[in-house]
Curated annotation (Swiss-Prot):
Cellular localization per UniProt: Cytoplasm
Similarity comment: family membership: Belongs to the class-I aminoacyl-tRNA synthetase family. Glutamate--tRNA ligase type 1 subfamily.
Catalytic reaction(s) noted: tRNA(Glu) + L-glutamate + ATP = L-glutamyl-tRNA(Glu) + AMP + diphosphate
Known EC number: 6.1.1.17
Single biological process term from Gene Ontology: glutamyl-tRNA aminoacylation
GO cellular component terms, A-Z: cytosol
Lineage: Bacteria, Pseudomonadati, Pseudomonadota, Alphaproteobacteria, Hyphomicrobiales
GO terms for MF: ATP binding; glutamate-tRNA ligase activity; tRNA binding; zinc ion binding
Intervals of motif 'KMSKS' region: 239-243
UniProt subunit comment: Monomer.
Known function: Catalyzes the attachment of glutamate to tRNA(Glu) in a two-step reaction: glutamate is first activated by ATP to form Glu-AMP and then transferred to the acceptor end of tRNA(Glu).
Top EC category: ligase
Protein name in UniProt: Glutamate--tRNA ligase
Length: 471
């Protein structure tokens, strides 16, 4: 059996959207699971819409997700001459022909089809015209001489057997009148030349599969195995769109998701292995196959993604998480402000705070928000809830504790011993003093455990913040 070769072939007209990322992941996993290769092709034939920025975003998105490819990136536009050679071959076989229909004639065909309530199709008027009738004042398009009877059958690894009556498929354009190849042709020639054995893509390409199969047959080439995976829908069941929220992989990165978590979430969008939800990359590769991909659309669930991300954050080592936070900061809107405040001392405080922070946060941005107390400058701006907690009685408790804290062994355990002893001596519950301490130290009513905050901020800064609220 020949080596499995898959490909991911995005068009660089925007960011790497979440559906494309899942398609790339499925291709990557299938190749890895079968001991094969995944190739990357940039389908940049739309010169107006294809941009270098979009190409960079795709490459960066794949790299961030941990999806690598084999060999050099293939650029479709650079292969236009090869695409034209394939058309010459079809012309010589009699499987393609020049068509001189004018734009006006094509409009008339469309209008007639609309009136008769049928899909617009080219009527084949130049299919069998003799060369003597060809006009000399305009250049033709080149069309495929598609079969008009029978059916084109796709044996799809996800959708099963899909049959297309050939009468419903017209003679599609292979080369435009200016000599540029169409997408439909370029895809077939590139997949053949790249040795692609398996095409895995969204089921919005299913009709394309029938047309492309006809091109393969016209060239006498083997047709790769195809698998058309269902699209991703929003939580409301509609096709995933901008109104459902973030779409690009870069947006999920900037929202503080970990690549391993997003990878894990994406693999479960349409594929399953029993009831297992959390997969290491090794487990994905071990278990992935197309027979476990469903036919119905998968719904994107942000809450589930958050929960999976929270799991990966808690499972990450503090060193890994610190690196992830440092990697995220340059991509945040206030990156310059954050980086300016990121002194060596504060970086060490952030490292020290991570064990407590990661237990509460579901994303890196939530974690950074929870760490804001480290970067706050005195006197702290108090949130409304924190102001409400710092009553006159609460401030009096803080003032009474300061001398005892000044003498404490400065650690989470040491400060906890002092505060618990004070609460017992004062005849109040621990929360009655711990919550005001939290508000005075962080300006908020939510934070990592208050004794961890003492340890992270250190003796001098902690006592100074407490004194600010009792002055």
């Amino acid at each position: 059996m020949s080596q499995i070769v898959t490909r991911f072939a995005p068009s660089p007209t925007g960011f790497l959207h979440i559906g494309g990322a899942r398609t790339a992941l499925f291709n990557w996993l299938y190749a890895k699971a079968k001991g094969g290769k995944m190739l990357l092709r940039i389908e940049d034939t739309d010169r107006q819409r294809s941009t270098k920025e979009a190409i960079d975003a795709i490459l960066e998105g794949l790299t961030w997700l941990g999806i690598d490819w084999d060999g050099d990136v293939i650029y479709q536009f650079a292969r236009a001459e090869r695409h034209r050679q394939a058309v010459e071959e079809m012309l010589s076989r009699g499987n393609a022909y020049p068509c001189y229909a004018t734009p006006e004639e094509l409009d008339e065909m469309r209008e007639l089809a609309r009136k008769e309530g049928r899909p617009p199709r080219y009527d084949g008027r130049w299919r069998d015209r003799p060369a003597s009738e060809r006009p000399t004042d305009r250049k033709p398009v080149i069309r495929l001489r598609a079969p008009q009877e029978g059916v084109t059958v796709i044996e799809d690894q996800v959708q099963g057997t899909v049959t297309f009556p050939n009468k419903d498929l017209d003679d599609l354009v292979l080369l435009r009148s200016d000599g540029t190849p169409t997408y439909m042709l370029a895809v077939v020639v590139d997949d053949h030349d790249m040795g692609v054995t398996n095409i895995i893509r969204g089921d919005d390409h299913l009709t394309n599969a029938a047309r492309q199969t006809q091109i393969y047959n016209a060239l006498g080439w083997d047709v790769p195995r195809m698998a058309h995976i269902p699209l991703i829908h929003g939580p409301d069941g509609a096709k995933l769109s901008k109104r459902h929220g973030a779409l690009g992989v870069d947006a999920y990165r900037d929202m503080g998701y970990l690549p391993a978590a997003l990878r894990n979430y994406l693999v479960r969008l349409g594929w399953s292995h029993g009831d297992q939800e959390i997969f290491s990359t090794e487990e994905m590769v071990e278990h992935f196959d197309l027979d476990r991909v469903g036919r119905s659309a998968a719904r994107f669930d942000f809450q589930k993604l958050e929960n999976i991300n929270g799991h990966y954050m808690r499972a990450s080592s503090n060193a890994e998480l610190f690196d992830a936070v440092m990697g995220l900061i340059p991509h945040l809107p206030d990156a310059e402000h954050r980086l300016a405040r990121l002194t060596d001392a504060r970086m060490e405080q952030l490292r020290a705070a991570l064990p407590g922070l990661k237990e509460r946060a579901k994303t890196l941005t939530e974690l950074l928000d929870g760490a804001e107390f480290i970067f706050a400058t005195r006197p702290l701006l108090l949130e409304e809830k924190a102001q409400a907690v710092l009553t006159a009685e609460a401030r009096a408790h803080i003032a009474a504790m300061i001398p005892q804290l000044e003498a404490a062994d400065w650690s989470a355990a040491g400060t906890e011993t002092v505060v618990r002893a004070y609460a017992e001596q004062a005849g109040v519950k621990l929360g009655a003093v711990a919550q005001p301490l939290r508000a005075a130290l962080t300006g908020r009513t939510t934070s990592p455990p208050v004794f961890d905050v003492f340890a992270v901020l250190g003796r001098e800064e902690s006592l100074a913040r407490l004194k600010d609220q009792t002055a």
